[in-house]
Structures are given as C-alpha cells and as structure tokens.
C-alpha cells in the first residue's frame, strides 16, 4: 500500500518545484519593468516669465488689510492685531484720543515724571477715537496702495528733497561689516541710510558714524513701544525716519510717536508711499517665485504652499536700496550678505532672520540690479535710469 502512494507524491513535489522556479520569470513577463517616462519638456521661458509676473502681482494680504483699515476707521482695533488680542486679555480700559494736545499717553500706573514711555498705551477695541487727520492719512494710504512703478521717479518730491542726492551709502546690519573698516568710506557719501535702529556707537570704524535717514518697518517701532523708555529717534531728533507699515494698527504707534516728540523741531516719522510698498513687494515675490521653480522643479503656483503668502514681505534693506535708486545718483551698499564665520548682525546676538523674508531671492535681485538692471521686472516700467549700484563685501 505504501509503494503506490510514494510515486504520486514524488510527482506532485516535482511539479511544485518546477512551478516555483519558473514563477519569477512569469511574473517579470506579466508585470514587466516600469515604463520609463520621458521628462516633462521645460516650460517656454516667455510663458514661465508671464506666469511669474502674474503671480507676483497677486496680493493675498489685500482683503485682510482692507478689513483692518475699516476696523480702525470705525473705532475698533483690528481683530488681526496681536496688540488687540493682548489688550482683550488684559482687560485694560484706558481711552486714547489721537490728538496732539493729549499726548503722550502713559502706561497705567506710571506717572509722566517717572518714565518717558509715550508709546505704551493699552487700547480697548470699544473706546478708540481717531484724530480726523489720522483718519484722512489712513484713508489716503490705503487708497494709494496700488501698482504704480512711476513712484520711483517722484520719490525726491515725495520725500521733500530739494533734488537728487549725489551719492548714498545704504548700510545693512550683517556681521560681515565687523573688521571691514568701511566706516570712513561710508561717511564720505553725501547721505547715509541705516536700517532698523542698528547701533553705531562702538562700531564707527566699521559702519561709520553718520546717519541722514533711518529705515524701519513698523514691527520694529511697535516692539520698541512695548519697552519702557522707548525713544522714537535713536539717531537723534534731527534724523528723519522712513517707515513701512506691516499692520494697519501700527499707524497708532506712528501717530503717537510723532505727537509726543521731545522737540518741536524733531524730524517726523514718515510712512512710505504705499505705491513703493507694492512695487517692492512685487519685485521680491517675483524673484522668490523664480527661485522656487528653479530649485524645486515644481509649478510656480505651488509657491504659496511653502510660505505664508499673506505675511510674505520684503526686508527693510531692500526698500532702502529701492529708495536710494530713486533719489541718488550713485549708490553704495554695505553690510548685505552672509559669511560662515560672521555674526548674523554686527550689533546683536540674533541667530537667524524671520521666515517672512526670502533673502536668497533678494540677493538675486541685488545681483541683477548691479549687473543688468534692465532685466529687473516692474523696475523697467519706472521710467528712470537706474544709477550705478555697487555692493561692498
């Protein structure tokens, strides 16, 4: 009985082994290698450029900004303002009337003789009264917020300058300035522009000692407003400040600072023309979009998925250079750029920049501005001859 069973079992085992041996080749024939996809053809340069220009012109911050302006004009602090959120949590109920004869407004619990602290004023959403002149300024600022590259041509008159400036030095804050000994060269220019209240005391040999115009963004002024003994003019009452607005609520800081100046002859804080803001924003966004496409190979439309598009912004330094292009016959730029062995900022221990800027994109713009300004988008519609721009490293 056992012998008849052994033979069929051996035959069955042989069939199974043969099938197992042939399975990989059968699988390869049935599945086959994955087809090799041909790479996508590169996008036509003219078509890509048109896409970048179109996307750079889109402004996702316009709708929330419009709401913030409306809130202020209706006597409410914008809900998007971090300040408004803090005040709602604190529950302060101090009135603020933005009228010159009522400033400065001091923090609750502080006597005017104790601290010169004019900007720290809690503003409840329910009790905000704007001076009529501030209301007009706010309306005008928002109404002018449109694309008009011709604003560069009109900058000398907009800034109340008697004419163009023969030579300008724009001084950034990079640590590469330390040890560069550019101080005397910087001060030899007819005008020196500085950024975000950077210290010059103790650094004059490398960064110069002269300041004719200070550029800041409104976040810097607002942060100053949170500290005791905040003075609006760190370079002295006679040095004008040009400030671009990051949030509509920061108009309150500007109005407060201007109204509480320690001297009747103090230079005022001027808000940049919003048409210049729009021009700067479009140029930097274009270069950021172009960098994104070149480095990732992805569609330009996907750029916004990697950044907070509504908060994306150019730097104070970029706008300072743009103003210099508009008002100066010759522009020298110092303290822009990074080095592995250099501090981030020459005057502080800050380690990195904010994500809302794209500095690599701005550096690409600077290279084009210095070497081939005719290719810079939007700038070529400004109707001006771009002056010589030299970057010192």
UniProtKB/Swiss-Prot annotation:
Lumenal face of the membrane: 28-393
Gene3D superfamilies (UniProt xref): Glycosyl transferase family 29
Segments on the Cytoplasmic face: 1-8
InterPro entries: Glyco_trans_29, GT29-like_sf
A GO cellular component entry from the record: Golgi membrane
GO MF, one example: sialyltransferase activity
Residues making up the signal peptide according to the UniProt record: none
Glycosylation sites: 49, 212, 258
Enzyme class: transferase
Keywords from the UniProt entry: Glycoprotein, Glycosyltransferase, Golgi apparatus, Membrane, Signal-anchor, Transferase, Transmembrane, Transmembrane helix
Single GO biological process annotation from the record: protein glycosylation
Similarity remark: Belongs to the glycosyltransferase 29 family.
Function, in words: Possesses sialyltransferase-like activity in vitro. Transfers sialic acid to the oligosaccharide Gal-beta-1,3-GalNAc and to glycoproteins such as asialofetuin, alpha-1-acid glycoprotein (NeuAc-alpha-2,3-Gal-beta-1,3-GalNAc-) and andasialo-alpha-1-acid glycoprotein. The transferred sialic acid is linked to galactose of Gal-beta-1,3-GalNAc through alpha-2,6-linkage.
Name of protein: Sialyltransferase-like protein 1
The species this protein was found in: Oryza sativa subsp. indica (Rice)
Organism placement in taxonomy: Eukaryota, Viridiplantae, Streptophyta, Embryophyta, Tracheophyta
């Amino acid at each position: 009985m056992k012998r008849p069973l052994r033979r069929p079992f051996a035959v069955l085992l042989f069939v199974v082994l043969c099938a197992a041996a042939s399975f990989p080749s059968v699988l390869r024939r049935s599945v086959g290698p994955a087809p090799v996809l041909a790479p996508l053809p590169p996008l036509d340069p003219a078509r890509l450029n048109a896409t970048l220009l179109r996307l750079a012109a889109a402004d996702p911050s316009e709708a929330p900004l419009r709401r913030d302006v409306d809130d202020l004009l209706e006597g409410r602090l914008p809900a998007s303002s971090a300040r408004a959120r803090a005040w709602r949590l604190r529950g302060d109920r101090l009135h603020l009337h933005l009228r010159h004869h009522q400033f400065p407004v001091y923090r609750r619990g502080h006597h005017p003789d104790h601290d010169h602290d004019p900007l720290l004023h809690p503003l409840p959403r329910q009790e905000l009264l704007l001076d009529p002149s501030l209301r007009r300024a706010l309306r005008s600022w928002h109404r002018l917020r449109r694309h008009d590259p011709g604003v560069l041509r009109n900058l000398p008159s907009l800034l109340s300058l008697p004419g163009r400036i023969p030579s300008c030095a724009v001084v950034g804050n990079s640590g590469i300035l330390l040890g560069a000994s550019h101080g005397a060269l910087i001060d030899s220019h007819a005008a020196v522009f500085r950024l975000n209240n950077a210290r010059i005391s103790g650094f004059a040999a490398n960064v110069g000692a002269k300041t004719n115009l200070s550029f800041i963004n409104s976040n810097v002024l607002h942060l100053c407003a949170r500290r005791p003994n905040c003075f609006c003019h760190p370079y002295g009452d006679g040095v004008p400040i040009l400030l671009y607005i990051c949030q509509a609520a920061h108009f309150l800081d500007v109005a407060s600072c201007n109204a509480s100046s320690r001297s009747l002859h103090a230079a005022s804080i001027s808000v940049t023309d919003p048409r210049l803001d729009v021009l700067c924003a479009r140029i930097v966004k274009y270069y950021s979009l172009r960098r994104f496409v070149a480095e990732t190979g992805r569609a330009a439309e996907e750029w916004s998925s990697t950044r907070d598009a509504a908060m994306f912004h150019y730097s104070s330094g970029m706008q300072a250079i743009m103003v210099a292009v508009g008002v100066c016959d010759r522009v020298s730029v110092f303290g822009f750029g990074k080095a592995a062995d250099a501090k981030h900022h020459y005057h502080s221990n800050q380690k990195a920049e904010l994500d809302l800027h794209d500095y690599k994109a701005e550096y690409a713009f600077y290279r084009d501005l210095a070497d081939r300004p005719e290719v810079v988008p939007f700038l070529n519609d400004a109707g001006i001859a771009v002056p010589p721009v030299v970057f010192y490293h």
